[in-house]
């Protein structure tokens, strides 16, 4: 009798589950629904970063002379940071030559308005169109040190007409690592939302070796997933991915930015 009761209870439970699945359960989550769900959860008010500019190409020497700069140097690299846009756009390796037959040092980064423009920018964006934020044309001011070394960081600031100050502290280790700390000082009586960003800008695709065990192109680790995108792949189709943590860069035969 107990066995019959157990079987009857199981059968009744199964019937209830089946009926609920048919009439009350939500539809299965498709890829399209999942994408829309993620979009809603992340919010649609986050601003996008779009600072595409048409620039007239000039020589490296002329480009470097067009804006005031902060010089940096340690035992491994030498270069400068442009106060226009606070861009790291001038970097030369002190210990690496272009070739075995040349004394010319390898130049990795170059100003935006050169043929091989290659630079690093960081800053903030906001959804409030009435707030002025620093962009690639903004002129930053320095305070304290005006030369960056592995022993002395530099501080930059830019203040808009609304009374909001944007600050950067840039430090350098004894090799190749820059660290940028950013903060905002809001002297107004209003609250604003800002989103920090960092980006690497490269004007053109460099010469690549096409060696099958070597990746040259975009490189990232996002949410613990390694991602490698070749230059030709992103020319054919744009690549986009959302993550909560990670890092990204551009890899060449010998260097990673």
What would you call each of these model-derived segments?
Residues 2, 35-37, 127, 166:
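Generic N-terminal leader/processing signal
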Residues 2-30, 132, 137-138, 172-174, ...:
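Internal alpha-helical transmembrane segments
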